[in-house]
Amino acid sequence: YFIGVPLLVSCEALATYVALRAVELFASDRLLIAVWLFRLVQCEAFYLLTVALKRLIIGKFAAGKRPGTLRDVLRRWLLDRFTRNALFLGATEPYVNTELLSRKYRLLGARIGKRVNVDFFDSVEYDLLDIGDEVVFGSCVVLAPSDDAEDLPIRIDDGANVLDHSVLLGGVTVERRAVTGTCT
């Protein structure tokens, strides 16, 4: 908490500062546009800070036995706090079912194929996700490649459907054109 919380608050403050500087460019008679721009810039700046944190401090997640060290726990906790933040959600949720959301997940380390209908999904270890071409996601999907003992990749083959409220655990392969039912 002595490292993670100040880092999270500092990144929120930096994103807000960047957004405020962008709003200063508008005249006062364009206030409605300025408010919209503020929120957009704030969320996108926080998202970019999250990507930088992932690449520079947290690093990649690899399949195998979890080390169980304090550093490992801290990096998972930090990324979880950043990806559950309202500013991160504001930078990802508006792009549901678009190629832009796939690109944003790729920047975090996920391997996502072409023409993937990605809804917002919950995950921390993006490096352990391998999603094929033409995959369809439902809403509220949880991809959890990690447990207390080990990290295992999750593979979703071409043309598969992962429907609403599904939870996929580490080591799972959803085969080509398979469909997971709702709440599985």
Question: Which ranges hold each PLM region?
Answer:
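Structural signal for interior beta-strand "rungs" in well-ordered beta-sheet cores
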Residues: Y105-T184
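Terminal amphipathic alpha-helical/low-complexity segments used for targeting or macromolecular assembly
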Residues: Y1-G109
